[in-house]
């Protein structure tokens, strides 16, 4: 990847809107900065097509695919390393998300990562922190999306607390205002439902404290525009959202009796169906977290994705930082992890891979899998690889998408033991697993012993390992282990040939 590419792009497949931004990277005295040069927004309302049994209907999928085809045209000339597309809550919970994503990736022309709630929160904070003036105090960032709401407390560019709750403007509007009707009782019930969710985190968050509250993304900005344009804020407050401003907006909405009859300055048509749900959640935020005023920012998830992408281009990949933290936390034997990782990569480099970018990515995943393959020893030596895989699959891992975590976890799970357990797993990359298992087998002594020249290759749908016969004769345990390894691969109908050479 070229350092500081002139243009980067991020795509946010939100539960309410799909958004694309293109940013230009510029070097300043304070470091690399990203300036937005283009943006597209499509009010897809994907969450509105989610049924009670968590299935996306065809109409919402079609809206999403159409939007992504238009985005794809704008991104047609971009290098894959300069684009990152992420999907959030609706595609986290939809049972047929895979069906949607297959067509979505074809429409966009780039991979789409489904990210976990806390990873979404981390990226939201990164975007917000880069778009507001520097401050020495702590900030609370609240991002009300279509299907979830993220709460982050951070200082400077570092998040301290991150949570994602399953309340959003689309899902809340569908649950409490399906026909757009609003009255005192229904609004109160919607507020209480949101409050019950926020109460889970409110005590801990208030104990941590903050000096500034910021609302990011569409709901906060839409509410701010409405209270500002219609003079709902108290005198002297020219921008942002005040408690009094929200209450006056609520009164106007209840008086109108239906969101479609509400006549206010700055009320955009695509915001009407989700206004009541978003307002009730923001009211609950103010009440449960004792907030009196919220400033707003345009910087949110998509800007955070751009800065994360920029970090990767400058070799500051958050995933590497996360793996390093896990190694410290779980007391990983660094020498052994390094040994296995280096050997696995050496084997992988002998295999055919025509795509240089794919090769570079796979080398990173092999290194991460080697670094994490023994973290399960912190639980038990027995079946440690299963414990390691469970942690890698389920822990919050900043920088990793769900797909990333699944890839690493599959390698970690498969590096030892029977291969049959992976037969039904879609996330297994068998050539990488071949390299990792062989490296782990040869590094069993956990010491820097000299290994002979070992050649590996793929042939006839399987693998071949070639090593000197003289060396094998002096290492009977390795000889036995290789025969067992070959038998294990044969069980899943993958040829595995060990050739002892005379050189």
Feature names for model-found ranges:
Residues 2-34:
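N-terminal basic/disordered segments at the start of proteins
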Residues 2-8, 45, 49-78, 90-96, ...:
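Helical "lid/coupling" subdomains associated with nucleotide-phosphate turnover
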Residues 18-23, 149-153, 223-224:
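Short beta-strand scaffold segments in enzyme catalytic cores
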Residues 32-48:
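N-terminal glycine-rich anion-binding loops that anchor highly charged ligand groups
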Residues 497-503:
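C-terminal amphipathic alpha-helical interaction region
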């Amino acid at each position: 990847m070229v350092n500081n590419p002139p243009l980067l792009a991020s795509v946010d497949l939100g539960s309410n809107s799909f958004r694309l931004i293109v940013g230009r990277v510029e070097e300043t005295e304070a470091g690399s900065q990203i300036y937005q040069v283009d943006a597209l927004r499509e009010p897809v309302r994907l969450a509105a097509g989610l049924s009670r049994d968590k299935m996306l209907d065809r109409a919402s999928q079609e809206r999403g695919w159409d939007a992504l085809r238009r985005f794809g045209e704008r991104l047609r000339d971009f290098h894959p390393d300069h684009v990152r597309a992420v999907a959030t809550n609706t595609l986290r919970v939809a049972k047929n998300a895979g069906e949607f994503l297959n067509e979505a990736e074809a429409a966009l022309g780039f991979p789409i990562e489904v990210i976990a709630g806390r990873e979404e929160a981390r990226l939201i904070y990164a975007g917000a922190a880069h778009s507001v003036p520097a401050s020495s105090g702590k900030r609370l960032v609240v991002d009300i999306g279509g299907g979830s709401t993220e709460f982050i407390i951070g200082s400077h560019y570092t998040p301290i607390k991150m949570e994602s709750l399953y309340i959003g403007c689309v899902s809340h509007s569908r649950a409490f205002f399906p026909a757009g009707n609003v009255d005192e009782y229904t609004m109160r019930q919607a507020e209480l439902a949101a409050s019950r969710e926020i109460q889970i985190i409110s005590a801990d968050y208030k104990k941590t404290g903050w000096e500034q509250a910021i609302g990011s993304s569409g709901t906060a900005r839409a509410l701010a525009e409405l209270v500002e344009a219609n003079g709902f804020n108290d005198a002297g407050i020219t921008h942002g959202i005040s408690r009094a401003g929200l209450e006056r907006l609520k009164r106007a909405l209840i008086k109108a009796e239906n969101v479609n009859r509400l006549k206010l300055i700055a009320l955009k048509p695509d915001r009407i169906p989700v206004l009541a749900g978003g307002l009730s959640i923001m009211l609950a935020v103010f009440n449960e977290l004792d907030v009196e005023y919220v400033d707003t920012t345009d910087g949110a998830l998509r800007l955070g994705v751009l800065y994360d992408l920029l970090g990767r281009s400058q070799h500051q990949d958050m995933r590497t930082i996360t793996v390093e933290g896990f190694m410290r936390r779980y007391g990983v034997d660094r020498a052994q992890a390094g040994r296995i990782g280096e050997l696995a990569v050496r084997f992988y480099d002998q295999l055919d891979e025509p795509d240089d970018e794919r090769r570079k990515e796979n080398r990173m995943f092999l290194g991460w899998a080697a670094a994490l393959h023994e973290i399960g020893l912190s639980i038990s030596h027995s079946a440690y690889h299963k414990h390691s895989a469970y942690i890698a699959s389920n822990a919050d891992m900043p920088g990793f998408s769900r797909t990333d975590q699944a890839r690493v976890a599959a390698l970690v799970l498969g590096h030892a033991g029977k291969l049959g357990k992976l037969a039904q797993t879609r996330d297994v990359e068998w050539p990488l697993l071949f390299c990792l298992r062989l490296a782990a087998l040869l590094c069993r002594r956990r010491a820097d012993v000299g290994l002979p020249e070992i050649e590996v290759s793929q042939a006839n749908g399987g693998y071949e390992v070639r090593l000197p016969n003289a060396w094998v004769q002096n290492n009977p345990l390795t000889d036995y282990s290789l025969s067992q390894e070959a038998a294990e691969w044969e069980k899943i109908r993958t040829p595995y040939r060990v050739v002892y050479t005379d050189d």
